[in-house]
Every structure is written in structure tokens, then in C-alpha cells.
Amino acid sequence: MGVAIRVIPCLDVDNGRVVKGVNFENLRDAGDPVELAKRYGEEGADELTFLDVSASKDGRGTMLDVVRRTAEQIFIPLTVGGGVRSVEDVDQLLRAGADKVSVNTSAIARPELLSELSQRFGAQCIVLSVDARRVPAGEAPQPSGFEVTTHGGTRSAGLDAVEWAITGEKLGVGEILLNSMDGDGTKNGFDLELLEKVRAAVSIPVIASGGAGTAEHFPPAVRAGANAVLAATIFHFGEVTITEVKDAIEKAGFEVRR
């Protein structure tokens, strides 16, 4: 058997509160990331990802507190991303209890940040988050047909998405979180072409994100080369459970952790 495919819920956190509404029964406080993290741990999540969407400085301090409290309650790896700009940011998050930190926009502005981080903390702690989309008509083409975006998928970074993933691996990151901005929130399934292209180009693990709508959407992503699958809305609203996703992946002939 190969390595088990990981199933990862993602929570958007703003000033210490979960942003996208959550529809779990009998949760005391559906907006508390720590409560939700616990629930997901109990439901069989292999890892958790927090995305800090707070713009304010206060939000950063609150996030460290959330990470601390979560790390005390759950026993699965926790990745934290959003607004990570420096060695100090990563140091604080890891000290607070994060296992991995994901870096996005700041690495586009200064790619050497990735090598500084992986040398200081180890590749296993550093995830490169890539917000990719198909190059729209009328824009400068990219070799792979996919480009890197910033500002929530609204602006082109002028980089080829596959090339950027290769650069990330060369600079020492341990994992690629590949977000399809075209798929994000559509529930039409993962962008398999994007996944296949990145998978063929790098040897580090790739996490597929963006587009999951049903449990049946997950096995094709794994077939396309995803080592892990990430989703937000469908888990939070109880549309699909982690168990259902694992059942579907296992039924397709892949190993999952139970």
C-alpha cells in the first residue's frame, strides 16, 4: 500500500472567529475555531488548516491565541496561513503550536523568503500556497495555461502556476497547497488538469483545494495526483462528512487513515 491520502478541513478565521458560517448541530459556539477543530479531530480529519483572513494587527495576536488553544485540544497536524510575511511570523506560529505554516503572497514578492524559512525551520514545516487559475482570454499567455493570482484570485501575479510550484520545490518547501481559483466555491469538482500538470512537475506532496461539492469529487483528484484533499464549505455545512470522503477515496482503491 502507498501512503494514506489525507483529508483536511480548512477554516477561515477573522479576528479569532470562523468566517464562513458553520452548520454543525450541538456545537456550543459554531464561530469558535477551537470548538470546530476539536469536532473535526473527532470526526477523523487527518490535518487541519487555519487561514487567517484578519487584515488588522490585532487579528494577528488573536490568531496566535487561537493556535495555542487549538494545539492544546487536538492531536493532528495544524497548518496556519494568511498574512505570513517573515521568519518572525513563522517562528511565532510554530511556537504557539502550529505544525506547518503556509506562505502565499509574500513569497511572490520575495521568493527567497521560502529558502530562508525552509533552512531555518525545515522543509516539513513550510507549505507554498498557490492560488492558480486558467489564464483568461486577452491576458499574456503562460506555458502551462495556468497563472498564479493574488488578492483572492482577482489579480494576476504574472507567473506560470506550474513554474511557480517548481520554483517552490527548488527553494525548499515541503508541500504545495494548490488552490484552483476557478473551482473555488463552485462545487463542480477539482481542476484535474491543473492538478495533473503540477503533479507531473514536482516530487513533493500536492494538496488539492477548490471545487469540492460531493464525496465523489475527491477520488478523481487523488487519481490526478493529489496526496491530500482540502475543503471548507462542504464540511462546515455538513453536506459531506470526512468519513464519506474517506469511504469514497478508499472505494476507488486508495489508502486512507482511519
UniProtKB/Swiss-Prot annotation:
Gene expressing this chain: hisF
Protein family membership: Belongs to the HisA/HisF family.
Keywords: Amino-acid biosynthesis, Cytoplasm, Histidine biosynthesis, Lyase
Predominant localisation class: cytoplasm
Subcellular location, record wording: Cytoplasm
EC number annotated for this UniProt entry: 4.3.2.10
Record carries keyword Ribonucleoprotein: no
Catalytic center residues: D12, D131
Description of how the protein assembles with itself and partners: Heterodimer of HisH and HisF.
Coiled-coil positions: none
Enzyme class: lyase
Signal peptide start-end: none
Free-text function comment from the UniProt entry: IGPS catalyzes the conversion of PRFAR and glutamine to IGP, AICAR and glutamate. The HisF subunit catalyzes the cyclization activity that produces IGP and AICAR from PRFAR using the ammonia provided by the HisH subunit.
Pathway recorded for this protein: Amino-acid biosynthesis; L-histidine biosynthesis; L-histidine from 5-phospho-alpha-D-ribose 1-diphosphate: step 5/9
Protein name per UniProt: Imidazole glycerol phosphate synthase subunit HisF
GO cellular component: cytoplasm
PANTHER family: IMIDAZOLE GLYCEROL PHOSPHATE SYNTHASE HISHF, IMIDAZOLE GLYCEROL PHOSPHATE SYNTHASE SUBUNIT HISF/H IGP SYNTHASE SUBUNIT HISF/H
Amino-acid biosynthesis among keywords: yes
Catalytic activity: 5-[(5-phospho-1-deoxy-D-ribulos-1-ylimino)methylamino]-1-(5-phospho-beta-D-ribosyl)imidazole-4-carboxamide + L-glutamine = D-erythro-1-(imidazol-4-yl)glycerol 3-phosphate + 5-amino-1-(5-phospho-beta-D-ribosyl)imidazole-4-carboxamide + L-glutamate + H(+)
